[in-house]
Amino acid sequence: MRLASRFGRYNSIRRERPLTDDELMQFVPSVFSGDKHESRSERYTYIPTINIINKLRDEGFQPFFACQSRVRDLGRREYSKHMLRLRREGNINGKEVPEIILLNSHDGSSSYQMIPGIFRFVCTNGLVCGNNFGEIRVPHKGDIVGQVIEGAYEVLGVFDKVTDNMEAMKEIHLNSDEQHLFGRAALMVRYEDENKTPVTPEQIITPRRREDKQNDLWTTWQRVQENMIKGGLSGRSASAKNTRTRAITGIDGDIRINKALWVIAEQFRKWKS
């Protein structure tokens, strides 16, 4: 379920309008990298990510969020991994907005990858759909631009299915025991060993805002996702010391958790249908 890329802490920018090239240059300079990293072979086809973005812009997709991983080796800064979330023009605002997640690097650590996602405005959470909705990978060879554009439309083609599943989850009620089970499953994704989880399932399913107090499957998932990604929950460590859960600040970890939570939610949807 993990992506073929590893992101640590990162620089990021988010706007509720299309990002400009100046903003991208300031926060994700690797998007404009002028050449491949010296470690790449002659077979590696190099195309700056900004060229891909401009082609996607021509097709009606605009970036609203961008981030780039921080690297210790400054020589790799211009080639480091980056992620952009793009929305279809005309579908910018709304409670939940479908997005295309584009990942890439020019140091050989990642191919182009595109994944369907959803942005939830009420809590500014970026959700990532599970593997069953498709994940497009384009290696750095051949007609990269054409394959990425084709992949973008493939991802766009599953948005209706994503929306249908989301609406179905909103209609499924979970009782307190079922919500507890969802929280327990989510904690196992993060900590693996139930004896090492610093917080309880009850904490992870607790809402942070009034509008998230509903007991449907979709809202339960949103509560769990936000609590896990943002952290800050009081708990006890394995050595019985007071602690707080850490926010997930790495992009790779964010996407891994998100995709796993989508799979759990899908399993609950099928179980309750």
Regions found by a protein language model. Name each.
Residues 16-25, 31-32, 47-51, 55, ...:
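General structural signal for secondary-structure boundaries
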Residues 20-21, 30, 34-35, 80, ...:
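Functionally constrained cores in energy, signaling, and assembly domains
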Residues 44, 68, 222-226:
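Generic detector of bulky aromatic hydrophobic side chains
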Residues 1-47, 54, 58, 265, ...:
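Intrinsically disordered, low-complexity regulatory segments
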Residues 46-112, 262:
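Amphipathic, interaction-prone secondary-structure segments
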Residues 1-9, 90-97, 102-273:
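Intrinsically disordered, low-complexity regions enriched in serine/threonine
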